[in-house]
Amino acid sequence: MQAYQREFIRFAIERGVLRFGEFTLKSGRTSPYFFNAGLFDSGLALARLGRFYASALVGSGIAFDVLFGPAYKGIPLAAATAVALAEHHGLDLPWCFNRKEAKDHGEGGSLVGAPLSGRVLIVDDVITAGTAIREVMQIIQGQGARAAGVLIALNRQERGQGALSAIQEVERDFAMPVVSIASLSDVLEYLAEDAQLKRHLSAVEAYRAQYGI
């Protein structure tokens, strides 16, 4: 685990974004942890989050031309990542997002910001079922662009109904990488090192053993 990943997990816990206990997921599974990126809900939190996204993206080495934030949650994430890339990595790159509903006046259309062209890097919080990414792929392909990869905050490393995780299915179906700031493996490592949080380690390990990839 790299230093920025450890810092990200600590930050997520401090903000209440990453919590431990007993949570019922949409899938019906009872999880010993819960991740809600919507709680990065202040200016300072979003700025720090953007720096973590930028660090993961630069570290991945993925080549891309434009950042894309899927409506709605991906919009501030793509913006924050673009700002962090410019301010902390000297990379001034274009970014854009889509509207859920196309406008019929003004600039019109369903896309806002830079042109969606070339190699597109998708920025989102998590990939749960992969449905949202499949919708985004239609938008990208409709513009004659191609997806370079996906950048998310946390990889749960959890299989869906089959043997693969939603992330693995996206990587397989679209032949592109999915990069995360941190993964469940990193969370487990963090728990093992933290005296106060170590009590949650066995429950998360058991969940990983049952549903992990």
Curated annotation (Swiss-Prot):
Instruction: Name the Gene Ontology biological process terms.
Output: 'de novo' pyrimidine nucleobase biosynthetic process; 'de novo' UMP biosynthetic process; pyrimidine ribonucleoside biosynthetic process
Q: Which cofactor does it need?
A: Mg(2+)
Q: What Pfam families does the record tag this protein with?
A: Pribosyltran
**Pathway entry:** Pyrimidine metabolism; UMP biosynthesis via de novo pathway; UMP from orotate: step 1/2
Keywords of this entry: Glycosyltransferase, Magnesium, Pyrimidine biosynthesis, Transferase
**Binding positions for orotate per the UniProt entry:** 34-35, 128, 156
Q: Which residues form a coiled coil?
A: none
For 5-phospho-alpha-D-ribose 1-diphosphate, which residues are the binding ones?
A: 26, 72-73, 99-100, 103, 105, 124-132
Entry-linked InterPro entries:
OPRT (IPR023031), Or_phspho_trans_dom (IPR004467), PRibTrfase_dom (IPR000836), PRTase-like (IPR029057)
Task: Provide the catalytic activity annotation.
Answer: orotidine 5'-phosphate + diphosphate = orotate + 5-phospho-alpha-D-ribose 1-diphosphate
Q: Which EC numbers characterise this protein's activity in its record?
A: 2.4.2.10
Q: Name one GO cellular component term.
A: cytoplasm
GO molecular-function terms, A-Z: magnesium ion binding; orotate phosphoribosyltransferase activity
**Out of the domains of life, which is the source?**
Bacteria
Task performed by this protein: Catalyzes the transfer of a ribosyl phosphate group from 5-phosphoribose 1-diphosphate to orotate, leading to the formation of orotidine monophosphate (OMP).
The family assignment reads: Belongs to the purine/pyrimidine phosphoribosyltransferase family. PyrE subfamily.
Subunit structure, as described in the record? Homodimer.
Name the record gives this protein: Orotate phosphoribosyltransferase
Gene encoding this chain? pyrE
